Swiss-Prot record:
Molecular function as annotated in GO: ATP hydrolysis activity; magnesium ion binding; nucleotide binding; RNA binding
GO BP, sorted A to Z: viral genome replication
Compositionally biased region (Polar residues): 45-57
Function statement: Plays an essential role in the viral genome replication. Participates, together with NSP2, in the formation of viral factories (viroplasms) which are large inclusions in the host cytoplasm where replication intermediates are assembled and viral RNA replication takes place. Orchestrates the recruitment of viroplasmic proteins such as capsid proteins to these factories.
Similarity-based family: Belongs to the rotavirus NSP5 family.
Name the record gives this protein: Non-structural protein 5
Keywords assigned by UniProt, alphabetized: Glycoprotein, Host cytoplasm, Nucleotide-binding, RNA-binding
The keyword RNA-binding appears for this protein: yes
Residue ranges, compositional bias (Basic and acidic residues): 17-38
Entry annotated with the keyword Membrane: no
Top-level taxon of the source organism: Viruses
Cellular component per GO, a single term: host cell cytoplasm
Post-translational modification: O-glycosylated.
Amino acid sequence: MAEASEFNFTIKRKQRTMSDRRTREDTKQKKIEEKSDIDLVDSASVYSQESSRSNYSDAYDKLKREPMVEESNDAKYRNFEFSEDEEVHRPSSKASDKSYREMKRKHDDINTSDSILEKLSELNLEIEKIKQMNQPITIDAAFNMILRNVDNLTIRQKQALINAIVNSMN
């Protein structure tokens, strides 16, 4: 009986390995068929890929040829006339260029005057701080400053302060 069970076991193992081999071969055949289908699709789309590449390269060449213009959006869109259908570009006149230049110059002047005024106010503030630092400290101001900072003093500093106040009273 033991020999019979061993024999059956090897037969079952062979059957399993054979079925595994068959499934592997089936999947390989399916993959090969899928690859051939993909190749057919690729060959059909070669023209579209080439045309898209050429379109990209043409667009890139156009971008390289366009001059780089640094304009603000306001100046750029001022020259466009909007209609119901589309944007129509109209050439800007020399008068508008002159007015634009004048407006830009005034704007620059305003910016420079604003920055100058800002710097002046900062300098005035610094001068006031320096004046306050250099003022002679009166006894009342020193006393008030000490009382404000008493909490920050250590115990020994507080004792020394009290001794100094008592000695100054004598």
